[in-house]
Amino acid sequence: MSVRHALLFVGLICLSISAVGQQPRGQRPPEAQAATPPANQPPKPANMETRKDVAEAPPVVTQHQIQVGGKTLRYTATAGLMPIRNTDGDIEANIFFMAYTLDGQAARDRRPLTFSFNGGPGSASVWLHLGAIGPKRVKMQPEGLMPAPPYQLVDNEFTWLDQTDLVFIDPVGTGYSRAAKTELNKKFLGVREDIQSVGEFIRLYLGRYERWSSPLFLVGESYGTTRAAGLSGYLVEHGIAFNGIMLISSVLNFETLEFTPGNDLPYILYLPTYATTAWYHKKLSADLQDLQKLRSEVEQWASTGYAEALAKGDRLTADERNAVIDRLSRYTGLSKTYIDLANLRIDEPHFSKELLRDRKLVSGRLDSRFTGTDSSPLGETTGFDPSMSAIRPPYTAMFNQYVRTELGYKSDQEYYILGGGFRFQDWNWGPAVTGFPDTAEALRDAFDKNPFMKLFVGSGFFDLACPYFATQYTLNHMGLTAQQHQSVSLGYYGAGHMMYIRDESLGQLKKDISAFMSGALK
């Protein structure tokens, strides 16, 4: 696992999700009598017994309203810490969450409820929260570029709150979520540990806020899709079944993404996104300007001629090799000499550096439409991602202002937005003994045990972190039945990993999710 991938993708872990589903759950907090909620407001969490004089801080509850489509949405926001206890009742960690419930709902326990988180591992939920789903969003330029400071937070006319209540979860080591003691980090920092603690949070929330009978949805982005897949299998084993799972920029089978010796699959699956990126930056010939035809042509050749050539390896004849070099150069915009030196195999870090080298620019990884400069024009790869650099400052500034001034949650602790909460090497990836991790197995398991579950998968055409063709490959190799495939919906967008930073893609994502949720509730 390269450092470049460290904050968005899991390393080579080997995790049997079915085994994860059978790990013992944490001790439930002592039972308490639930209070009756005031009219049109969610119930307050029941008072929970504490142990060893460790008191829980009550969540902060505030009232708000926004304008959406000419209508006023009035809602209640709750921000606070959910304690995670051990079998003795001691608090071992606190998970920070922000929840939004629409006011004026007669049967709240029947209103849909969606749990949301981002990825990393090490990323807080701020990206989906203030980018796509929540009632407020960070205002970017129309194509997703960073605006000039000071940044703005505006009403999100594309919020999902009109259809579902929302809960944003920051796993331990992200946001304000912390282990109670440093030595307890190991109980939360790991693939299995993370699934268990987030699963325990969901169980606790359903109980404390009396939402056990609500239709349930789960949405994750990037490594959050890995977590969501694991949770779908883990929680169904504990009696919690979801109506729908939404995967944004997904990675389930890591064999499709990891450029390691002997694994040619990523080179094949990245190629359509390389071509799309080269098209965007005007690196392709005049006869390749129809983007839809270009993608279809490259997908077809990548799956056939290119895959066959890589399978032949050193057995390729000189003529065969030259033909592949010609085709790769045509589709990627890279020189034939460079492709030859790369042995027909271009990984993402080298592609992002080489494509625009003649312009002294590098292209983005999370969103390959973005460009930037770096300090080493002669370097083989770039040291930063210009798309992340454009997104991070506005989201960091606006969240820290928003959580204090609008949600009323004040803390001197640093809110870990992306990294900083733990060392990457402290994450427990599990025993690497069975090859690449493939959490699609957990999702398949959930489909088998919950035949009513629906799946939505959204991908950006300019995402070089989780390329759309790799996602297609994974979905087509899950072993789903024809009927199960009918429960899968796909969405594609003309942007990158965080497709919602682009106004047009944000609107389309909202339409797609709205239709998906309506179908999942039938």
Language model regions located:
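A catalytic-pocket lid/entrance helix-loop region that shapes and gates access to the active site
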Residues: P135-K139, G233-G333
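Alpha/beta-hydrolase fold nucleophile elbow
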Residues: E210-S222
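Glycine-rich nucleophile elbow surrounding the catalytic serine of serine-hydrolase chemistry
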Residues: G220-G233
